[in-house]
Amino acid sequence: MGKAMLRAGFADTNSSNMNESFARLHFAGGYLPSDSKDWRTIIPSLLMAVCLVGLVGNLCVIGILLHGVWKRKPSTIHSLILNLSLADFSLLLFSAPVRAAAYSKGVWDLGWFICKSSDWFTHVCMAAKSLTFVVVAKACFAYASDPAKQESIHSRTIWSVLAGIWVVASLLPLPEWLFSTTRRHAGVEMCLVDVPAVAEEFMSMFGKLYPLLVFCLPLLLAGVYFWRAYDQCKTRCTKTRNLRDQMRSKQLTVMLLSTAIISALLWLPEWIAWLWVWHVKAGGPMPPQGFIALSQVLMFFTSTANPLIFLVMSEEFKAGLKGLWKWMITRKPAVTSEVQEAPAGNTEALPGKAPSPETQTCILDTDGRGSPDDSKEKSGKVVAPILPDVEQFWHERDAVPSAQDNDPIPWEHEGQETEGCN
């Protein structure tokens, strides 16, 4: 998540001078020097397991939402959920592997660009998620108040809101991009935050305001809007006849509220560690390395928990997953045998096509001219023939209309026809 620690020292007690020099360093990019081989194995393994499960879950959610966009006009809430899933997918695809690689090595060998952009990119995705929670909570409240109103929002408005979220999220952690760099210290290549003296006051203010702007205020506003939306759903469900939309609104509100609460709880240890290392006093205790490492694992686990919540709590996502699976199966290439003609001697039509009455008659005539053995074999499949006199009767009736058909008062002649027959 940002800095692994602000003032950290190696566990090696044999070199006190080295510890004193390391205590003044600001590590960045997930780089956390440690002499423990267990931590270098456990933390990367946990990160990769979380990464694999989360990538599969987010791919399912993204596929369901994109399949829905392809079939119909995207809704505001679905577009915002898609934005959440894209942020989670980006975190797991780009940031988690970098953290795993940084933890597994005692030196930084991932290059200058990754060192400079790692913390910035991680915070961009987290800020985008926090801002998206605020917007989706506001959309849930609007949908609970008037479900029909949400359908009238133009697609350009939705994409403009999403673009604005990512622009703001990119600007908030920009100081981390400016001051993160690689340095060689005590013969070891490290990823550090090198703050010049003229910018120390600015970075001190940044350390106080950034968690407030990215974590506290957005989730507080989102919680208020979610609670109002939930209360609105309970009120309107007792007064409206359109219970289907209200039940859907309540389900979406509960699902997204659960996602916001889980995200806040899993982010909390990381922000505690972040504030601890930024505001520790000179000579004060530093957070344990294990706490810092596990807090970052929990932060990435948030991106795995979100798609699981969507797929478990939403009936709409369950149905969408089934529909997406059926769509993927039915899009297989057509079998070439379906377009080929039926072979000779097997004239019982292609699969799925019923033969016409004329075809049935032709088959019957052909069978009649065949050998007796063939007739015996096909006796169970022969259709009853049309009698010649019946066929001639209907043919003459269709070809030559009778006078009775043109008689405007046929009931006057019914008695005469009966007498003539007698």
Swiss-Prot record:
Q: Which GO terms describe its molecular function?
A: G protein-coupled receptor activity; identical protein binding
Disordered as annotated region, ranges: 339-422
UniProt subcellular location? Cell membrane
Q: Which organism is it from?
A: Mus musculus
PANTHER family xref list: G-PROTEIN COUPLED RECEPTOR 151 (PTHR45695:SF1), LEUCOKININ RECEPTOR-RELATED (PTHR45695)
The gene that this protein is the product of is Gpr151
Q: Which residues lie on this side of the membrane: Extracellular?
A: 1-45, 98-123, 179-205, 281-290
Q: Does the keyword Lyase apply?
A: no
- Basic and acidic residues bias: where? 366-380
UniProt keywords (A-Z) are: Cell membrane, Disulfide bond, G-protein coupled receptor, Glycoprotein, Membrane, Receptor, Transducer, Transmembrane, Transmembrane helix
Pull the Cytoplasmic topological domain ranges from the record.
67-76, 145-157, 227-259, 312-422
In terms of superkingdom, the source organism counts as Eukaryota
This chain is glycosylated at 14, 19
| Gene Ontology cellular-component terms listed | cholinergic synapse; presynaptic membrane; synaptic vesicle membrane
What this protein is reported to do is described as: Proton-sensing G-protein coupled receptor.
* Record's protein name: G-protein coupled receptor 151 protein
What does the record give as the organism's lineage?
A: Eukaryota, Metazoa, Chordata, Craniata, Vertebrata
Q: Which GO terms describe its biological process?
A: G protein-coupled receptor signaling pathway; regulation of synaptic vesicle exocytosis; response to acidic pH
Q: How does it sit in the membrane?
A: Multi-pass membrane protein
Which residue ranges traverse the bilayer? 46-66, 77-97, 124-144, 158-178, 206-226, 260-280, 291-311
Tissue-specificity statement? High expression in the brain and lower levels in kidney and liver. In the nervous system expressed specifically in the habenular area (at protein level).
Q: Note the Gene3D superfamilies from the entry.
A: Rhodopsin 7-helix transmembrane proteins (1.20.1070.10)
List the disulfide bonds in this chain.
115-191
